[in-house]
């Protein structure tokens, strides 16, 4: 038994390193605010940056799932880490708006490869009944990287006058993650039978249950990226704080993300998914109310904390349901679900348009609230399916 536990840990630890590297994508919110300030961009122009990241989830998720059928999950994860390193290096070569767009594109491509392949690779290490809690723990590790990014960026900006010192640090960590995983042994089951084509994968969205889960991912990521980018702007608008101080709002969000994931991995092992899903969505509803009416710093922080905790476990709960619904098509299902990360492109663009039109971040909060409303309907569906 000790040998089994050792082998399990030996396979899981490098995967958790990869989850940490996956969290670097959440630096887009912090980076967007600094780039916006430096180049004096409008909300709409600035929000093109996170859109360049999440556009690739829509374009490449299904092709990545097909690539996994050819080269395997582990090699796909390794390829994702290499692309992420390129994204970290580019801004160090030249700091301009076009280069940042290209860097964000590479970050999006790398993260697409990683999200599609890393989650099902976890399924090669753990069995079905532990999948949701293990994926949640992976999200906890990812959230640690998300949490420290804005803190480090603010500290580098104040201490050294250069927030971009974040890039070489994250680049080095990505290299370490790639080397660790590359030298680790993980057994992958062979793909049996005829593999699906691109059209076959897309047709799976014709299943109403699959479509509902896909749209749930769209809403979850839209909320996540939306809060990531808008939280500092809300504080700047209502309290007049400088960006270096307002950026801490993003850290508040990402502090409660790992707390939610850590407690969620335990709770999900003890209770029905729909109950925890419903509680999570309720916290987000309270958060939206707070973000609409909040005028004090502490009140806004509490609202951000609520959505951080509430949104932290939505992804693994939806994703595990999707994988377990079609275990024979886990690669294809993974690709479809990750394609839902297009919400990270759609929501910021709509938020930018709404906030520019209203001249207020109320527009951004309204767009985010649409995603929360959809998750309310999905919570009722979860309840019915688990009766």
Mark where each language-model region is.
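Helix-breaking motifs and short loop linkers at transmembrane-helix boundaries and internal kinks
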Residues: 40, 72, 93-98, 240, ...
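Central cavity-lining transmembrane alpha-helices of secondary-active solute carriers
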Residues: 51-65, 251-263
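Cytoplasmic helix-loop-helix junction between adjacent transmembrane helices
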Residues: 103-140
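Intracellular juxtamembrane helix-capping segments at the cytosolic ends
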Residues: 113-126, 312-326
């Amino acid at each position: 038994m000790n040998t089994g536990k050792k082998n399990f840990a030996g396979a899981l630890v490098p995967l958790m390193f990869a989850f940490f590297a996956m969290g670097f994508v959440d630096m887009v919110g912090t980076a967007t605010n600094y780039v916006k300030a430096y180049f004096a961009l409008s909300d709409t122009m600035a929000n093109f940056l996170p859109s360049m990241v999440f556009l690739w989830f829509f374009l490449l998720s299904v092709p990545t799932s097909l690539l996994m059928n050819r080269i395997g999950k582990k090699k796909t994860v390794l390829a994702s880490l290499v692309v992420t390193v390129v994204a970290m290096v580019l801004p160090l070569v030249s700091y301009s708006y076009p280069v940042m767009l290209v860097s964000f594109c590479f970050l999006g491509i790398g993260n697409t490869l990683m999200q599609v392949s890393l989650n099902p690779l976890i399924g090669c290490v753990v069995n079905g009944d532990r999948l949701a809690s293990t994926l949640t723990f992976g999200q906890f590790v990812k959230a640690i990287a998300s949490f420290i990014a804005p803190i480090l960026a603010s500290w580098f900006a104040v201490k050294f006058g250069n927030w971009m010192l974040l890039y070489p640090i994250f680049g080095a960590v990505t290299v370490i993650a790639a080397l660790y995983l590359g030298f680790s042994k993980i057994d992958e089951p062979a793909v049996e039978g005829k593999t699906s084509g691109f059209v076959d994968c897309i047709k799976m969205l014709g299943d109403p249950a699959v479509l509902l889960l896909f749209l749930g991912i769209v809403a979850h990521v839209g909320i996540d990226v939306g809060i990531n980018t808008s939280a500092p702007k809300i504080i700047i608008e209502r309290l007049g704080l400088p960006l270096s101080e307002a950026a801490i709002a993003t850290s508040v969000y990402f502090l409660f993300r790992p707390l939610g994931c850590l407690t969620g991995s335990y709770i999900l092992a003890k209770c029905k998914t729909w109950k925890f899903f419903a509680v999570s969505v309720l916290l987000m509803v309270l958060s939206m109310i707070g973000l609409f009416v909040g005028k004090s710093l502490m009140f806004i922080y509490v609202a951000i904390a609520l959505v951080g905790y509430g949104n932290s476990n939505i992804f693994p709960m939806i994703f595990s349901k999707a994988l377990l619904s079609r275990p024979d098509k886990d690669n294809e299902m993974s690709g479809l679900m990750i394609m839902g990360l297009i919400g990270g492109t759609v929501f910021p663009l709509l938020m930018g348009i709404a906030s520019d039109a209203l001249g207020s971040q109320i527009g951004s909060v309204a767009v985010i609230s649409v995603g929360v409303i959809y998750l309310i309907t999905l919570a009722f569906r979860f309840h019915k399916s688990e009766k």
